[in-house]
Swiss-Prot record:
The keyword Glycoprotein does not apply. The lineage of its organism: Bacteria, Pseudomonadati, Pseudomonadota, Gammaproteobacteria, Chromatiales. InterPro entries: ATP-synt_VA_C, ATP-synth_a_Xtn, ATP_synth_asu-like_sf, ATPase_F1/V1/A1_a/bsu_N, ATPase_F1/V1/A1_a/bsu_nucl-bd, ATPase_F1/V1_b/a_C, P-loop_NTPase, V-ATPase_asu. It holds the Pfam family ATP-synt_ab_N. Keywords: ATP synthesis, ATP-binding, Hydrogen ion transport, Ion transport, Nucleotide-binding, Translocase, Transport. ATP binds at residues 232-239. The keyword Translocase applies. It comes from Nitrosococcus oceani (strain ATCC 19707 / BCRC 17464 / JCM 30415 / NCIMB 11848 / C-107). Its EC number is 7.1.2.2. Belongs to the ATPase alpha/beta chains family. It is an enzyme of class 7 (translocase). This is V-type ATP synthase alpha chain.
């Protein structure tokens, strides 16, 4: 026990000897949750994850004997937690629409009964170590929750519970730890959020995370286990892009962390996700989704904890052998929380008031992504996608610039594209992906070997069109040759028929990889056939007037993912239309 000495917003000072950094504490008569972040002699600096209004010096501070941690076990999926893993559904039942300060509710429902199936390969007397699977629980109809020996524990298995129904607190196994010590294991365990969960070794990424968004999958792919950033100014569509990724990505588990964003955006997520169907299983999307909601009107330092809570939950499912994608919206709000705490601590600010350790904290967070061989021998991955909200869209500000140096995939959102109603507003000029060589091998093996060449040609066409657009803006389209005008038309086809994608269109919202490549190939075929006719002397006006061009723009929404073969038949119609135009001019003597 200790005594509170000073209250400075979310930061308090207490006389609390012999309590290490990182330890979780309870503050005052309300029992507010806090964490020790520094020491000065016998005094501890504590950041408080709840509002400190009415808290006064002299109140008691209780050290809980463990760091800020989360409870890991069956029952996580489908839940909505706040920034310190309190379930919002049960908080609503306990305290109403406003979360009462100091309310204590465990992250997992303790009374719920789970059907446990022991691992048939284990028996009493066998040596087990951290990460070994003791058995499984059907958490949802599509996800099997594997019960693991917590990392750091090892010993001889004394007993393993038979198949049956158990609560989270029931003992399902006992380990002989040596020195006449035994350890009881239950369906759940706790893990400190700031400590990355261990693994055997890192593995190279081998397959892309397919999001169903054409500009991301086809032009700037991200590998499973990779790290990506989505920077963009206000109104550019960051939240919508991240929600689309969370909805449609081919990961096994999706964790959406709303960190300091507006409450109405998170309400939209909470309202829409339960009604969506997972395209990969046909079941409810919430059966593989976990939400951490920490809105802008919640205590600022809780934003900092919410990202660590989200990534720890992701690592837990990774250790079970699953591919996890974590969507963090947004890391800028997290960095602002660091700035506020650093300012109250009196630390020397650097760029734009951020603390000097901003870059190292960002790097440490993103380093928790990766594809790994787990302690249990399986392979799992955590893919981290963080939104960045640079003020005024300035990508040179500290959070964006440091993030750009860390990530391997950068999906830069453009205000100009958003203003032109081009969504997703991902800029093909400023975005990049370092994962293209590996992704190309996957596309060649599973879809088509010409993917990389087609992508490169489309990017070249878009770049050429950008240069020609500057000329058009200065002197008008009449200054361009027929070939140059056709380059502009080819780039427009790619933009409107491939890159633009409606999240509200039930057909176009998700695009399968097979359809993505056929659409890319279709646009390039139109361009190639037009170039051939131009070389034969056909006027560019004749090409621009072909009805198939308008139909090609609509293919993305006219053909479902199951109609790829029908879409391929349309390419034959295009060849016939261009061939017919060439023959007409030849017969008329115009060529």
């Amino acid at each position: 026990m200790g005594k509170l000495l000073e209250v400075n917003g979310p930061l308090v000072r207490a006389r609390l000897p012999q309590v290490p950094n990182g330890e979780q504490v309870r503050i005052g008569t309300l029992g507010l949750v806090g964490e020790v972040i520094g020491r000065e002699g016998q005094e501890a600096l504590i950041q408080v994850y709840e509002g400190t209004e009415s808290v006064r010096p002299g109140e008691e501070v209780e050290a809980l004997g463990h760091p800020l941690s989360v409870e890991l076990g069956p029952g996580l999926l489908g839940q909505v937690f706040d920034g310190i893993q309190r379930p919002l559904g049960r908080l609503l039942e306990a305290s109403g629409d406003r979360i009462s300060r100091g309310i204590q509710i465990q992250g997992l429902e303790q009374a719920r009964v789970w059907r446990f199936q022991p691992n048939p390969q284990l028996a009493a007397g066998m040596a087990v170590t951290g990460g070994v699977c003791l058995g499984a629980v059907p958490e949802t109809p599509t996800i099997e929750h594997r019960i693991l020996v917590p990392p750091g524990l090892s010993g001889e298995l004394l007993e393993l519970a038979p198949e049956g129904e158990y609560r989270l607190s029931d003992v399902i196994a006992r380990l002989d730890m040596g020195d006449h010590r035994s350890q009881a294991l239950t369906l759940s365990h706790r893990w400190p959020v700031r400590n990355p969960r261990p693994y055997q070794q890192r593995e190279h990424g081998v397959s892309p995370l397919m999001t169903g968004q054409r500009i991301l999958d086809t032009f700037f792919p991200l590998l499973k286990g990779g790290k990506a950033a989505v920077p963009g100014p206000f109104g550019a569509g960051k939240t919508m892009v991240q929600q689309q990724i969370a909805r449609w990505s081919n990961a096994d588990i999706v964790i959406y962390v709303g960190c300091g964003e507006r409450g109405n955006e998170l309400v939209e997520v909470l309202d829409s996700f339960p009604e969506l169907t997972d395209p990969h299983t046909g079941r409810s999307l919430m059966e593989r989704t976990l939400l951490v909601a920490n809105t802008s009107n919640m205590p600022v330092v809780a934003r900092e904890a919410s990202l660590y809570v989200g990534v720890t939950l992701g690592e837990y499912y990774r250790d079970q052998g699953y591919d996890v994608v974590i969507v963090a919206d947004s890391t800028s709000r997290w960095a602002e929380a660091l700035r506020e705490v650093a300012g109250r601590l009196g630390q020397m600010p650097v760029e734009e008031g951020y603390p000097a350790y901003l870059a190292s904290r960002l790097a440490a967070f993103y380093e928790r992504a990766g594809r790994v061989q787990t302690l249990g021998g399986s392979v799992g991955s955590v893919t981290l996608i963080g939104a960045v909200s640079p003020p005024g869209g300035d990508f040179s500000e500290p959070v964006t610039s440091h993030t750009k140096e860390i990530v391997r995939t950068f999906w830069a959102l453009s205000k100009d594209l958003a203003d032109a109603r081009h969504y997703p507003a991902v800029s093909w000029r400023e975005s990049f992906s370092d994962d293209i060589p590996v992704a190309a091998r996957w596309w060649a093996e599973h879809i088509d070997k010409h993917w990389q060449a087609g992508r490169a040609e489309a990017m070249t066409l878009l770049t050429q069109a950008e240069e020609l657009s500057r000329i058009v803006n200065l002197v008008g389209p009449e200054a361009l040759s027929g070939t140059q005008r056709w380059i502009l038309e080819g780039a427009t086809l790619i933009k409107e028929g491939l890159l633009q994608q409606s999240a509200l269109d039930p057909v176009d919202s998700f695009c399968a990889p097979e359809k993505q490549f056929v659409l890319l190939d279709l646009m390039l075929q139109i361009y190639h056939q037009g170039v051939e006719l131009l070389e034969q002397g056909v006027p560019v006006q004749e090409l621009l007037g072909l009805p198939v061009l308008a139909r090609a723009r609509r293919c993305k929404s006219d053909y479902k993912n199951t109609q790829v073969e029908t879409l391929q038949d349309f390419t034959k119609e295009i060849k016939e239309a261009f061939g017919r135009l060439g023959r007409e001019h030849a017969e008329a003597g115009k060529i």
